[in-house]
Amino acid sequence: MTDETGVTRKAYPTDLSNEQWALIEPLIPPAKPGGRPRGVDLREVLNSILYLHRTGCQWEMLPHDLLPKSTVYEYFALWRDDSTLTAMLAALRGQVRVQEGREPTPSAACIDTQSVKTTEVGGEQRGYDGGKKIKGRKRHLLVDTLGLLLAVVVTGANLDDGTAAPQLLSRVTAEELPRLTVIFGDNKYHNHSLNAWLAKHRPQWTIEVQSPPAGTKGFSVVRKRWVVERTNAWNGRSRRNSKDYERTTASAEAMIQISAIHLMLHRLAPDDVPVTFNYRASTVTPITVAA
């Protein structure tokens, strides 16, 4: 791939197209005044992050024709900690909603959780979800009715959904979501302390519990809540999200945000060029197995 920066290499399927880069480049904070001029190609930084995110590789296993781990992780940590990823998420979400014929901000949202296993690398906030029999972490998601991410919090899997809800809802303000009035959730959010928190901190918002029909056994798709399950499926397209591989919950939350950012970039600027994979070189003779 050759772009205006002079970088030349073979393109990866996760690389940003020119149209996608034009959408996200203005959302990257400029370099701080003073000091040396920025010498890093930020498009390649994003390409490297997206490659790691989609393939699930380790930081040290980034291909040699992408940027080195030290550079990529430095920007990942910077954008994670200075809320750049959160700002990208909000800006792109508003554009996608307008493209879909909606207002830039939602009037309704959905809240739910997903428990995922962690790995042996260690890290903070791990626990056991007795209901789902999973040892690891829990992803608390707030999405709009299109399934677009509004906020995410990652905790130990043992933390009750209703108990963690104020932490999740505090990630967004009434000023950021001025039209929001109702949040759909399941019975776990029928919680006195949660309602008390809402009355004090977010009086404009109410939780509306959506339950399966009486007598339903096992999993049941519930209207107005199923969009969160679809969002979980979108997140699962990236191997980095197949488990929680991160040492910190901040990095785990950032990986969910990156899923949403990548999804919305493809919604706004679809990549219509098919990627061809050559799984077998033309010079390789197929092996014939005798019957």
Where are these predicted regions, by residue range?
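Short alpha-helical elements
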Residues: M1-A291
